From Swiss-Prot:
Keywords of this entry: Endoplasmic reticulum, Golgi apparatus
GO CC terms in record: endoplasmic reticulum; Golgi apparatus
Name the record gives this protein: Uncharacterized protein C577.11
Pfam families the UniProt entry points to: DUF3074 (PF11274)
Taxon lineage: Eukaryota, Fungi, Dikarya, Ascomycota, Taphrinomycotina
SUPFAM superfamilies: Bet v1-like
Superkingdom: Eukaryota
Subcellular location: Endoplasmic reticulum; Golgi apparatus
Length: 239
């Protein structure tokens, strides 16, 4: 049976050999299962420990029962349309993130299973000068769930002989789920979107120990601000 992608208390990288090709007879069921695994995380976030609201962003936390990696969640409401959010988050997710977040760089695609839907990307994350940059190799799955919502999930992928980050980087691990749905007013007209995000990270080495709850939640709020500013610059409102 296929393992729940996010069910463990710890981040569990998947082997590149376990990323099915679109021609595999089990591909459709494999893709559906990992999307459902991600949706379970989205549904759980309101039940996590509430850390308060900051700049219009509701923050949540779920610590592992014993040892492992803590999940952090955020929920925010936005007045931009679902169509505009698709341009910013659904398509070329990693490439766009490198455009609006200055800490993400050297993003490039390693594999394409289905273009703009299931891809493997590699990117680097800038760290303080006294640490080596972090390197991520991520499976990125981007799916329209229905006309009114979409989901993007990431989980780390390992390749044979890829334990090293190469150059001056250290391999790190990252799970994330982004869920965006259309918000409607009382008359059924679109009034923006709801953006729900869950992340957990293992930066590796001593670097992870520097990230307290406060540091990480500030980072989550910062990303919303950076994204909104970039979206408004790149896709300005008409009129």
């Amino acid at each position: 049976m296929q393992q729940d992608l996010f069910g463990s208390d710890s981040i569990c990288p998947i082997s590149s050999d376990d990323v099915l090709k679109a021609t595999d007879p089990n591909f459709e069921s494999w893709r559906e299962r990992i999307v459902q695994d991600a949706l379970k995380i989205v549904e759980q976030i309101p039940k996590w420990k509430h850390l308060g609201n900051h700049d219009g962003v509701a923050l949540y936390e779920k610590a592992p029962a014993y040892t492992g990696h803590t999940w952090y969640g955020r929920v925010s409401k936005h007045t931009r349309s679902l169509k505009t959010f698709k341009k910013g988050l659904l398509y070329e997710h990693i490439k766009k993130e490198a455009d609006y977040d200055p800490l993400v760089f050297s993003a490039h695609q390693l594999e394409t299973i289905i273009e703009d839907e299931i891809e493997i990307w590699m990117y680097k994350y800038k760290t303080p000068w006294f640490f080596r940059n972090r390197v991520y190799r991520q499976l990125v799955v981007s799916v329209m769930l229905d006309p009114d919502s979409f989901i993007v999930l990431q989980t780390p992928v390992t390749y044979p002989g890829s334990s090293s980050g190469g150059g001056n980087g250290v391999v790190a691990l990252y799970d994330s789920v982004d869920f965006v749905s259309k918000k409607l007013d009382g008359d059924g007209k679109e009034e923006g979107v709801l953006w729900i995000c869950a992340v957990r990270n293992d930066y590796g080495s001593m670097f992870s120990g520097l990230f307290s709850d406060t540091t990480f939640t500030k980072s989550l709020v910062r990303q919303v601000k950076l994204y909104n500013e970039w979206l408004n610059r790149t896709y300005p409102r008409k009129g």
